[in-house]
Curated annotation (Swiss-Prot):
Matches recorded under SUPFAM superfamilies: P-loop containing nucleoside triphosphate hydrolases
Protein name: Phragmoplastin DRP1E
Function per UniProt: Microtubule-associated force-producing protein that is targeted to the tubulo-vesicular network of the forming cell plate during cytokinesis. Also plays a major role in plasma membrane maintenance and cell wall integrity with an implication in vesicular trafficking, polar cell expansion, and other aspects of plant growth and development. Has a GTPase activity.
Assembly and oligomerization: Forms homodimer and may homooligomerize and heterooligomerize to form the phragmoplastin complex. Binds to PHIP1.
In-chain residues carrying the UniProt-annotated modification N-acetylthreonine: 2
Region (G2 motif): 73-75
Keywords carried by this UniProt record: Acetylation, Cell cycle, Cell division, Cytoplasm, Cytoskeleton, GTP-binding, Hydrolase, Microtubule, Motor protein, Nucleotide-binding
Reaction catalysed by this enzyme: GTP + H2O = GDP + phosphate + H(+)
PROSITE patterns membership: G_DYNAMIN_1, G_DYNAMIN_2, GED
GO function terms (MF aspect): GTP binding; GTPase activity
Highest classification ranks of the organism: Eukaryota, Viridiplantae, Streptophyta, Embryophyta, Tracheophyta
Top-level lineage group: Eukaryota
């Protein structure tokens, strides 16, 4: 059977560890960790300025230790962890930010709270969500943890931003919104409960009242003839937990430094002898409130432990997976660094080849270049213009010169064919460029998909540069090859193709008297348009044959010179150069993204926190 001390102490230890790591709730964004703090049951003390909130806390502790003054005094959350010690032991306090330093003078505790507040917020009345942790060890307290939050206010004082009221409420809400937060709502009895800032906020976040404890202060300051029974007995505002009345020290008592133990006795006497509240005396006062909260907190902790363990185990799994993805810290040994770089290059190369071979998307775009882009480009070549009747007549005439051809204008044919074949250079080079750009995109995509490389932006840049440099060399070789294919077609025409064409001798054009035209007539006048159309048709047929050939051979050249080489030797030059580098240069390639290094460190710290918390819970024999 677990004890109240062990359960509340367990939560105290986990809370302190959370604060050290910066986990005090309110984490947002895709990179935010699960907040262990928010899963822990807490008691948040909420009240307006001058509600008597500080006096209630001091009554529970039995010590005068909180800063006092006008305006906003509490400007950072104060996590107050109370530890009951054996009777006769000396009281002392410890701050989380001053480990192993014990304060026995509680006036110095007050000063340190003020100084530590100013260290974060400055002295200009600003507020901060970063909590101060204060542990008090005393035989006069119960085991309990309370979070003192800044007092709710409506107006800003000099030196504060105009949004201070909204800022404070927003901070308070980050605590009380959480389902594991117990709300201790402090309201003064000498004001209408309907106007209580604490009750308004509690009702907003806890409309059923199951998480709210109402505390009514300043009962002794109410007008004569009036009392607060309507509230204390739950008739004017009902909560699921009983209201507790408190009588704090008067300002005169505070000025005289009246002992808190004496103040407790006076409070008990007030309720015991009060004609209005005597019947409620056993359930009134700061001592009863402390015991009530301690018992309830222990009960809530016991109930929540299974869900806390579930969150911890889930978070441990997620963090371990993330750390695996990010990889271990980089080795400092040059040999190990070189091995790490080569392993990552091999991982990249594997992914790159998978894109080309169909294991991943992207390689099909190269086929699209050959099956769609190249044929479309070949169809768009201006052969119709080149082989128009006017163009054929002009080229044949220029090829004949001063001696017209006798039967077939061979020189004209050759000029027409060579001119037409020159157009194939454009689609050939465009195919090479298109394949090059696909390969470059696959390099970029493969680098981004290589998990191991994500840690090292410098290596990513150098690897991309090396791969693209190799692709550029492959492109140049490929262009030479495809241009060579076109030039080969121009260099030697297939005469057999023309021998198989139907042969028709064109008869010279005769004059009206059935006489042959004069030899001195222009060449173009010797043959009819049909002769030149037949030449254009023959040349077109030959060009189409060459086009079909190039449509098959250009892809072969691109694949052989670019795709095949990219698979075989994309990083060969990089490998030869990287092995010559010294340790410092290798280390520069393995400089990680600072954000990633920070994330790994945070993950490792958070993982340590969760594992420690799990061990702490396992060490407590709590009853399920």
């Amino acid at each position: 059977m677990t004890t109240m001390e062990s359960l509340i102490g367990l939560v105290n230890r986990i809370q302190r560890a959370c604060t050290v790591l910066g986990d005090y709730g309110g984490g947002t964004g895709s990179n935010a960790f699960n907040s262990l703090w928010e899963a822990l049951p807490t008691v948040a003390v909420v009240g307006g300025q001058s509600s008597g909130k500080s006096s209630v806390l001091e009554s529970i502790v039995g010590r005068d230790f909180l800063p006092r003054g006008s305006g906003i005094v509490t400007r950072r959350p104060l996590v107050l962890q109370l530890h009951k010690t054996d009777d006769g032991t000396e009281e002392y306090a410890e701050f989380l930010h001053l480990p192993k330093k014990q304060f026995t003078d509680f006036a110095l505790v007050r000063r340190e709270i003020q100084d530590e507040t100013d260290r974060i917020t400055g002295k200009n009345k600003q507020i901060s969500p970063v909590p101060i942790h204060l542990s008090i060890y005393s035989p006069n307290v119960v085991n309990l943890t309370l979070i003192d939050l800044p007092g709710l206010t409506k107006v800003a004082v000099e030196g504060q931003p105009e949004t201070i009221a909204e800022d404070i409420e927003s901070m308070v809400r980050t605590y009380v919104d959480k389902p594991n937060c117990i709300i201790l709502a402090i309201s003064p009895a000498n004001q209408d409960i309907a106007t209580s800032d604490a009750i308004k906020l509690a009702k907003d976040v806890d409309p059923t009242g199951e998480r709210t404890f109402g505390v009514l202060t300043k009962l002794d300051l109410m007008d004569k003839g009036t009392n607060a029974l309507e509230v204390l007995e739950g008739r004017s505002y009902r909560l699921q937990h009983p209201w507790v009345g408190i009588v704090n020290r008067s300002q005169a008592d505070i000025n005289k430094n009246v002992d808190m133990m004496l103040a407790r006795r006076k409070e008990r006497e007030y309720f015991d002898t009060s004609p209005d509240y005597g019947h409620l005396a056993s359930k009134m006062g700061s001592e009863y409130l402390a015991k009530l909260l301690s018992k309830h907190l222990e009960s809530v902790i016991r109930t929540r432990i299974p869900s806390i363990l579930s969150l911890i185990n889930k978070s441990i799994e997620e963090l371990e997976r993330e750390l695996d993805r990010m990889g271990r810290p980089v080795a400092v040994d040059a040999g190990a660094q070189l091995y790490t770089i080569l392993e990552m290059c091999r991982a990249f190369d594997k992914i790159f080849k998978e894109h080309l071979d169909g294991g991943r998307p992207g390689g099909d775009r190269i086929y699209g270049v050959f099956d769609n882009q190249l044929p479309a480009a070949l169809k768009k070549l201006p052969f119709d213009r080149h082989l128009s009747l006017q163009s054929v007549k002009k080229i044949v005439s220029e090829a004949d010169g001063y001696q017209p051809h006798l039967i077939a204008p061979e020189q004209g044919y050759r000029r027409l064919i060579e001119g037409a074949l020159g157009y194939f250079r454009g689609p050939a080079e465009a195919s090479v460029d298109a394949v090059h750009y696909v390969l470059k995109e696959l390099v970029r995509k493969s680098i981004s998909e290589t998990e191991e490389l994500k840690r090292f932006p410098s290596l990513q840049v150098e690897l991309a540069a090396a791969a693209n440099s190799s692709l550029e060399k492959f492109r140049e070789e490929s262009k030479k090859s495809v241009i060579r294919l076109v030039d080969m077609e121009s260099a030697y025409l297939t005469a057999e193709f023309f021998r198989k064409l139907p042969q028709e001798i064109e008869r010279p054009v005769t004059n009206s008297k059935n006489q042959t035209a004069s030899p001195s007539s222009a060449t173009l006048d010797q043959y009819g348009d049909g002769h030149f159309r037949r030449i254009a048709s023959n040349v077109s047929a030959y060009v189409n044959m060459v086009s079909d050939t190039l449509r098959n051979t250009i892809p072969k050249a691109c694949v052989y010179c670019q795709v095949r080489q990219a698979k075989l030797a994309l990083l060969n030059y990089f490998y030869s150069q990287i092995s010559k580098r010294e340790g410092k240069q290798l280390g520069q390639l393995l400089d990680e993204d600072p954000a990633l290094m920070d994330r790994r460190l945070e993950c490792a710290k958070r993982l340590e926190l969760y594992k420690k918390a799990r061990d702490e819970i396992d060490a407590v024999a709590w009853v399920r």
